[in-house]
Amino acid sequence: MERTLVLIKPDGVKRGLIGKILNHYEEKSLEIVALKLISASKDDAKEHYREHEGREYFQGLINYVTEGKMCAMILMGEKAVDVVRKINGDKDPVKAELASIRGEFTLDKTHNLVHASDSPESAEREIAIWFPELTCKDSYKKTVDLFQKIDGPIINV
């Protein structure tokens, strides 16, 4: 089983498309393992899209994803990364299959409704940005902090 991150961007949230978009994923037997509404900070957005930094559209992209609430989710299933990207469709709505999310709902190339991780490695990096409470490293730190409060300092070997 593989995990992937999906963000329903502010235009999808504002247009009330969360339920319709979720249906597309659930119809393909993808399991929603985490979901939350978020307001992305500029720093989190820049970290998420860091590979685009320096490109002419970068600042516009950051402004777009921080202009309103987003719905962040972790989906799990067989080949989840590839399945989700196929369900989402091409970023250009003219090229997207009509049955895809972007083919059905996207109004223009810039406001393309959804983001999906492009590889299992990207998925884990992106999940750590938007769901830090679910990362092992963070859970370990919380456990260590808890024991330090109870028993005093812990010595790492």
Residue ranges and their predicted role:
Residues 1-157:
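Non-catalytic terminal and connector segments of soluble metabolic enzymes
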